[in-house]
Amino acid sequence: MIQVISDVLTPDELKRFRELLGQAQWQDGRATAGHVAVRAKANEQLSHEDSLGQQLSEFLLERLGKISHFIAAALPLKVLPPRFNRYTGGGSYGDHIDNAIFSVPGAGVRIRGDLSATLFLSEPGDYDGGELIIQGEFARHQFKLPAGQMILYPASTFHQVTPVTRGARLAAFFWTQSLVREHSRRALLFELDNTIQALAQDNPEQPAVARLTGLYHNLLREWSET
């Protein structure tokens, strides 16, 4: 299940993010890649210890907790603090699958990466290339979203970022450990949740709303891990 989540940041917030990231001290992104992915990775990232990155990361974590689409689709248990990357001058990231387990810096906590997310911070017209290509079950999907939109997808899928041949592609990225590990079960719960919301909007008093809501919570109870 791939989801596009709109309006994560406002235009003013995006402008401020880009201004601050324009002053940041970027480092070679290969420092955080695994021994296989390092050969495919050519970008820049902010250090986990960068105070600016930590400030922006905390802001995004708080915002994510208020976005109902993200919560319904991801059913988050733990979220790795967002990180930031930049692609310029032909930078790219070849086909790879993300690591399964991540450590939260300074917290002594590990999370399982069930879902990957990329929040676009640069407008599509500000750079050439830089498409995020995700291998779906039956086809490859290509994304180059407007700034402020986020793509959420299973971390178990192959994906890549095509070379950026003009301008700079700024993005935030992070991983989520879901209450429901299995992607197909999470997708069923998301569809059921959407159905309940649609029925409740038309007629919240109809008995089917209560029955389906009960079914949703019983399935979540059966499938969730805390």
From Swiss-Prot:
Record domain Fe2OG dioxygenase: where: 78-178
One MF term in the entry's GO annotations: 2-oxoglutarate-dependent dioxygenase activity
Keywords tagged on the record: Dioxygenase, Iron, Metal-binding, Oxidoreductase, Vitamin C
Superkingdom classification of source: Bacteria
EC number of the protein: 1.14.11.-
Record's keyword annotation contains rRNA-binding: no
GO BP term, pick one: DNA damage response
SMART domains in alphabetical order: P4Hc
Alphabetical list of Pfam families matching this protein: 2OG-FeII_Oxy_3 (PF13640), PKHD_C (PF18331)
Cofactor list: Fe(2+); L-ascorbate
InterPro entries assigned: Oxoglu/Fe-dep_dioxygenase_dom, PKHD_C, PKHD_hydroxylase, Pro_4_hyd_alph, Pro_4_hyd_alph_FE2OG_OXY
Chain positions recorded as Fe cation binding sites: 96, 98, 159
Gene3D superfamilies: q2cbj1_9rhob like domain (2.60.120.620), Rabenosyn, Rab binding domain (4.10.860.20)
Cofactor remark: Binds 1 Fe(2+) ion per subunit.
Top EC category: oxidoreductase
Positions annotated to bind 2-oxoglutarate: 169
NCBIfam families: PRK05467.1-3, PRK05467.1-4
Name the record gives this protein: PKHD-type hydroxylase Nwi_0701
Species for this entry: Nitrobacter winogradskyi (strain ATCC 25391 / DSM 10237 / CIP 104748 / NCIMB 11846 / Nb-255)
